[in-house]
């Protein structure tokens, strides 16, 4: 496993872990049952993504990136409170920005993995890209129809 692949795997582990923290924070700041259910589903999916990247790194005996627990929790809490105080519309805007960042990163990684002939990894990356696109579309739709 080359250094660039290791860097990408760690980058995606961190990105997916951050998305999980962000979406979990939204669940705890809302009373809208449908909204919470959607974020619970996103947490489930993004956790699966993070677990996948963790497993690939662990299988290669590469140390996982570590996050200072309280600092990472604080970031999730801060983002949740900040967005909660500005409303669901802005929560969705921030979520869309996160999903767009993830989609851009996935597209780059998919291209890089094609060049390296990592076909099994590419298939998984494409599945995860679709998940990110679906999340972004849900957030956009919710933002449009639920002021």
Named regions from a protein language model:
Residues 1-147:
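Non-heme di-metal
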């Amino acid at each position: 496993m080359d250094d660039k692949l290791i860097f990408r795997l760690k980058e995606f582990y961190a990105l997916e872990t951050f998305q999980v923290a962000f979406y979990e924070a939204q669940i705890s700041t809302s009373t809208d049952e449908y909204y919470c259910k959607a974020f619970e589903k996103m947490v489930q999916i993004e956790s699966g993504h993070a677990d996948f990247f963790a497993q690939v790194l662990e299988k290669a005996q590469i140390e996982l990136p570590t996050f200072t627990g309280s600092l990472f929790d604080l970031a999730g809490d801060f983002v949740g409170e900040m967005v909660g105080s500005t409303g669901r519309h802005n929560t969705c805007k921030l979520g869309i920005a996160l999903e767009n960042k993830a989609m851009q990163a996935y597209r780059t990684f998919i291209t890089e993995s094609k060049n390296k002939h990592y076909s099994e990894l590419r298939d998984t990356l494409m599945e995860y890209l679709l998940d990110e696109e679906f999340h972004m579309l849900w957030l956009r739709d919710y933002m449009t129809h639920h002021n």
